[in-house]
A protein has these predicted regions:
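Rossmann-fold NAD(P)-binding glycine/threonine-rich loop
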Residues: 1-3, 15-18
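A generic secondary-structure signal
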Residues: 19-22, 101
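Contiguous beta-strand/loop segments that form the cofactor/metal-binding neighborhood of enzyme cores
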Residues: 15, 27, 32, 36-86, ...
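Beta-strand-loop-alpha-helix segment that lines the small-molecule cofactor/substrate pocket
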Residues: 1-9, 23
Length: 177
């Protein structure tokens, strides 16, 4: 069984990683991942009693007890600190995993910095976690750069084949995913 990092099962991804790891294009300098999906406001809903069909105590698990509101359950949980960590941990983990996979023999980064926030054209909503975030990790001589942009999508980047992708910058060229 595989959970959460299914892109490692793709023959195309494995072929790309083999080419990068072989040194065919020189040393990997920067491994980038993007998650640029439109993630608009989740709105604001009042606190209420959970519906009868939902055992909210089980749903909440060991996290600090949350108040039930319809912006939390079922999909938008990742916009709240007690339940998630934003789009970097929702969609982002898939592209970040591929970016890290490209860094041969990577273990843990030696340095990390990250900045972001929750920015909405509609103003504030109930969400807490970032919908815009830039993270840079150092793995020796290779940087892993990961970016989530929740206010943009394909229309803003017509040359990108998907809203989520990876790019690999090497001494001898670039592979765009």
């Amino acid at each position: 069984m595989q959970h959460g990092t299914q892109r490692r099962s793709s023959p195309g991804e494995a072929k790309t990683m083999a080419a990068i790891h072989s040194g065919k294009y020189g040393k990997l300098l920067v491994s980038k991942g993007y998650c640029c999906k439109s993630r608009w406001s989740i709105g604001t809903k009042p606190i209420e009693t959970p519906p009868d069909y939902l055992n909210f105590d089980i749903w909440n698990g060991p996290a600090q007890k949350l108040d039930f509101h319809r912006t939390l359950v079922h999909y938008n949980w990742h916009w709240f600190w007690e339940a998630g960590n934003g789009d970097i941990g929702n969609q982002g983990v898939h592209e970040m995993d591929v970016a890290r996979w490209a860094i041969k023999d990577a273990t843990l980064p030696t340095k990390v910095w990250s900045m972001g926030g929750r920015f909405l054209p509609e103003g504030k909503d109930q969400g807490e976690t970032p919908n815009q975030q830039l993270t840079v990790m150092e793995f020796g001589e290779t940087l892993l750069v990961f970016e989530t942009r929740g206010l943009t999508g394909n229309k803003s980047f017509p040359d990108w084949p998907t809203q989520v992708t990876n790019e690999f910058y090497m001494e001898g060229g670039v592979i765009k995913g």
